[in-house]
Design a protein with these regions (language model features):
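PRPP-associated nucleotide enzymes
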Residues: 1-175
Length: 175
């Protein structure tokens, strides 16, 4: 795909991820939060972020989907659930992008049934303009406008996640 415009280069991304790690480290002093990576998109951000959090962490993974091959299906599906016991624990959900907020809201409601002390959200990208439900992003990497993005974990039909930068696709192909 050659029809894209770079929005964030690798250095800019890494600088912001380091700042987020420092902020989370300050906020969770003397605690050992459970940090949950929302697969697949957040894996690059999650790996870089957790290296910059200078605390003991318990990490886990979940995969919840409402997307199929670049399109939205609108149906929530829990594909892979966490294995950590989170009752009485502080939880940080790490997301690649918060768009409508529906998927995240659904997962937070599932987690809250397990009685964590707190659930906070750390997202690489926040698309506030597209929010359809009331979801607070506690730690946001970057606010971005509407547009289809690839790179640094974001994909189009499972491709382009490995790009070290974030780019907006110009005239994305129709799925």
């Amino acid at each position: 795909m050659d029809n894209y415009k770079i929005l964030l280069d690798h250095e800019t991304i890494q600088k912001r991820v380091k700042e987020l790690g420092e902020e989370i480290t300050r906020d969770y002093q003397c605690k050992e939060p459970v940090v949950i990576c929302m697969l697949k998109g957040a894996v690059y951000f999650f790996a870089d972020l957790t290296k910059n959090i200078k605390l003991p962490l318990m990490i886990d993974f979940a995969r919840l989907s409402s997307y199929r091959s670049g399109t939205t299906s609108g149906q929530m599906e829990l594909i892979y659930d966490i294995t950590a016991k989170i009752e009485g624990r502080d939880v940080i959900l790490v997301e690649d992008i918060v768009d409508s907020g529906k998927t995240l809201k659904y997962f937070i409601e599932l987690l809250n049934k397990r009685n964590p002390t707190s659930v906070k959200v750390c997202a690489f990208l926040d698309k506030k303009e597209r929010r359809e439900v009331d979801i607070k992003v506690d730690y946001a990497g970057f606010d971005i406008p509407c547009g289809f993005v690839i790179g640094y974990g974001m994909d189009y039909a499972e491709k382009y996640r490995e790009l070290p930068f974030l780019a907006e696709v110009i005239n994305p192909p129709k799925a």
